[in-house]
């Protein structure tokens, strides 16, 4: 995970007198790689997977020039980048989702994202937000350091080596998987940590050539920034023989919480401290998939004091048996819809019915977990400004968001509507409106709901699909307070604060304040489900987007994106 060259020098832990502009360059290209030992064509960032670590300090401004060098017609050739978790105050034009806040960047063109970081700190990531493109490799870590980190006394080491970006992996392109209409091909074949993994762990040695290796010194404490950059996979993360102390979730510092392991869904981030307090040896960093059978991401933790030649860990790496509910999900005979995020209209989903019958004998038997302390997400207490967004008062506006699956078409829906990308980006529609933005300005398929400004909003997110899987739901432009999980008692005093929350059919209730005008995408972070319609847009205070102290001011390069994209479509009809 090589770091790009800074154009402006940044001191990580020395408080700056003035905020700086930190510049990066990302070249998006096609190339052949084999992160798990099997070669495939992928979408690369600066020639690699994952992309380089982007980092800066609290208060800095990021300027990231993205150059599109994509040429392979069997892959997506246009692109856009989303900066997951960054709030983008007055900056919705650089949030990144194609056809929501911008038109895509076409081949042989570039676009520079300028992002004031303001008071945000923590662990984030960036990824393509064009159809399912990030599945093919366009993803990387992003960290905003706090020179006055309130947890600084808890760790000794926090650098690029302790950033762990985990991701599921496929041996065929996402475009081909979507075109097949076969749900069984949505199952990842392996998983990686910092771009290394083993497709066939039983016949591939575990060593620093095949697995990411973190070297530690006995007695030191390491801040691990764990990022789940997966398309669908959720993981249970642990370090063999060591406890971990959770200190942040989704960029929000939390009260320290010591556990043996924690679950992390697609899009989520967990910061934890591990103390190197065991006998010098080699230990597994384990991340078995909890929603896909018989797959595990691994890395190695090696004590520098162990002077012996390299040797693998003594014990087997942790395996995990998926629940019967997950087996039921992969056994469901439902069609797989596609084509809803094209942005150019006219695509009709060609769907093939698919099912995968998993015999119980093929699933690893569940290990005895009675002595393992696993993080309870409901116990994540924000370190600063705890409390629900609405306080003890009722929300100003309560919206029920019920997700479900149309088994006939294979499309996921929210409140009965599968989202489909518009031809004109939502933000552009808002900015060019002359007579007051209303919901009638958007088609039913765009599924855009207007939120009033400076109000406390409550979403009741629940499902009626009957499919027992946890959906990682993400809202751009905000963090939210999770005041209730399922039928558990609500918590308005110190609820968890995140930007991705897992929801089953039983549901969750979340609260946030509409203090950030812009069109913000809400969607399932299982990218197949997003592509199949599990999304909608909240146009927050649209009149304030057009004018006033919180307005979004676009520049000429942003204004030129759609014209370039329209011209590209003329010679590449029906493509992305």
Swiss-Prot record:
Cu cation 3 binds at residues 129, 476, 523. SUPFAM superfamilies: Cupredoxins (SSF49503). GO terms for cellular component: extracellular region. The keyword Signal applies. Binds 4 Cu cations per monomer. Its EC number is 1.10.3.2. Residues 21-145, 157-304, 376-576 form the Plastocyanin-like domain. It catalyses: 4 hydroquinone + O2 = 4 benzosemiquinone + 2 H2O. Disulfide bonds join 103-562. Keywords: Copper, Disulfide bond, Glycoprotein, Lignin degradation, Metal-binding, Oxidoreductase, Repeat, Secreted, Signal. It is found in: Secreted. GO terms for biological process: lignin catabolic process. One of its GO terms (molecular function) is copper ion binding. The keyword Signal applies. Optimum pH is 6. Lignin degradation and detoxification of lignin-derived products. Homodimer. This is Laccase-1. The lineage of its organism: Eukaryota, Fungi, Dikarya, Basidiomycota, Agaricomycotina.
